[in-house]
Amino acid sequence: MPDSFPTTDMALTHILVVSDVPESNRWYQDVLGAEQYREYETSAVLSFNGVWLLLVGGGDPTPDKPEVLFLPPDARKVSHSFTVRVENCQASYETLKGRGAEFLTPPYDWGGEIRCFFADPDGHLWEISQLTA
């Protein structure tokens, strides 16, 4: 039997638990330029450069995840982040800052990479990174 995972017709979806779905939905569209695919009462589906983002308002355990709670993150503790590779970190920084992104610092040159970080309204961490070496 041929291997059935992964296949070429698969798509990766990131589930982001947020405290306010409409606010986060607006932020992802206005700041990151994501496109809304669908919106529901307690969630929204966005497309961002070929990746699906599912914004959900939290949730209790369900039969298929019996001991798992979906909770918004603690912005001071990060166990996951997104990195977007860009050609020009400074230009991307200026664009995103102009759209309302709040950066932790301006771009920093590590010698081989220039990067900086910002967070969405709930503290999900995003990085823009330019490889220079």
What is each residue range found by the language model?
Residues 15-21:
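Conserved beta-strand-loop-alpha-helix junction that forms the acyl-donor binding cleft
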Residues 24-29, 96, 123:
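Conserved active-site tyrosine of GNAT-family acetyltransferases
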Residues 1-13, 35-84, 93-119, 130-133:
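Vicinal oxygen chelate
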Residues 20, 88, 120:
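Acidic di-acidic motifs
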Residues 32:
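Major-groove DNA-recognition helix of helix-turn-helix-type DNA-binding domains
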Residues 23-24, 89-93:
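Short, conserved charged micro-motifs
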